[in-house]
Amino acid sequence: MRFLSKFFSLIAFAMFCTTIFSANAEAAPSIKYRVTHVRLIDQGELEVQGYFENEGDRDAYAKCITLDLTLIADNGQEMWSNSGIEHYIDVYVPADGALEYTFYVQDEEIPEYHGKFRYRWHTHTNWDTSAG
C-alpha cells in the first residue's frame, strides 16, 4: 500500500511539472533576413534584394536589419566592404511565412562597376511581436 501511495504521488508530481513547464514553452517568432541578390545601381548606391523568413509559430514584425556586406570583383579583389549597416523598418511577417523585401544602401565609397562580382553577407534581424 505504501508503494502504491508513493507511485501515485510521483505520477501526480510528473503531471504537475508537465503542466507548469509546457505553459512556459510559449510560442515564439524567429525572423531572419536572407540576401538573394545585390545589384550596383550607380556609384554610391546599391540595392539589396532578399526576404524575411519567420521560422517561428507566431506572427511578428521585423524592426531592424543589421547587414555586413562585402563586394568582390571577378578577379578576386575586394571592391567594397562595410559592416553594421542598419536599416530600420516595421514589416509584418506571418508565422511560418516569408516576405520579399528590397532596400537600398548609400555610401560614397561604393564603386561604379560594370563587371561581374560576387558578395558575402551576414545579417542580424531584430523583431518584436507588436507593430510601431
Question: Each PLM stretch: what is its role?
Answer:
Residues 9-19:
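Bacterial N-terminal signal peptides
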Residues 25-51:
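Low-complexity, acidic Ser/Thr/Pro/Gly-rich terminal tails and inter-domain linkers that flank the onset
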Residues 52-57:
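Asparagine-centered strand-capping/turn motif at beta-strand->loop junctions
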